[in-house]
Amino acid sequence: MESEFQQHHFLLHDHQHQRPRNSGLIRYQSAPSSYFSSFGESIEEFLDRPTSPETERILSGFLQTTDTSDNVDSFLHHTFNSDGTEKKPPEVKTEDEDAEIPVTATATAMEVVVSGDGEISVNPEVSIGYVASVSRNKRPREKDDRTPVNNLARHNSSPAGLFSSIDVETAYAAVMKSMGGFGGSNVMSTSNTEASSLTPRSKLLPPTSRAMSPISEVDVKPGFSSRLPPRTLSGGFNRSFGNEGSASSKLTALARTQSGGLDQYKTKDEDSASRRPPLAHHMSLPKSLSDIEQLLSDSIPCKIRAKRGCATHPRSIAERVRRTKISERMRKLQDLVPNMDTQTNTADMLDLAVQYIKDLQEQVKALEESRARCRCSSA
């Protein structure tokens, strides 16, 4: 078949190169009509060809499991004899015989449909290929009324009751184990001895999921227990991590080692020191004012970030001081010069002050001259 396709391809390629270039109507990159006619004849020859017995046997085995399937394992683990022949399923009486059903001769794609009550059916879909007719016996309908089969396919999915038994703490314990443990291996090992008695039998996994890896279940109880073996939970987390007794002792020891020379800031009240919370604030400030002053005297002042608009450069600081002095002197000048508007700018204020000073100087000069000319008569 492939050789015929290649031959037609070469003929088409030669035909396109041998056509005259200056013809009126040119069929660009199109095949001649003779090519498609010969192609149809080759398809008819293939359709008339009967399928092999091995293909018919495999297809009939798939189609017989379409309507009813009581067990998932009977479908997944399809058994064959030692000589390669399929083990025949139990015979069932049929009503309509020799029903012609078109199936694929090359390949089929199976669709596994799982209904709500656990029924599983297989629907072979016709894939790319040529269609051949295969006769099979039609399965009779069952007498009991079952729910309609759902069209949603669940490929490689887990059983319906699997995810309801998964516990968040189990997944967390597995993650902690993969991270190398969280310091709770001893507690896990001792608590696993009572796991088998505390785990209910009703939560065990269904038999259809035995091929998958088992997922453990953890009962939420004060004493952490699980039915996993000790080696599985050896790296799990410790349930007593939030216990204030062990945590406070560790934090207190850590505070003692890190505090160092801060013992001088301890208060004199022994009762209040004994009633401290579990978390020791060893880096907190002392409570008394004298201790705070001593701490501030020993500490080195750190650089504080300048406010917005306040630069820390020496020239900027000098300019800011100069402007501050000018502002103070202008306020004094406003007090000395009468009828000076405070909203006037600095230049106008200076002009008014200069004019006022000149007027004062003229008045002083006139008074001095009048005093010099004045003669007091002696009595």
From Swiss-Prot:
Positions with biased composition (Polar residues): 190-200, 235-261
Residues the record lists as Phosphoserine modifications: S74, S213, S234
CDD domains to which the protein is assigned, alphabetical: bHLH_AtbHLH_like
Coiled-coil positions: none
GO CC annotations, alphabetized: nucleus
Subunit-structure text: Homodimer.
Protein's name in the database: Transcription factor bHLH122
Species assigned in the record: Arabidopsis thaliana
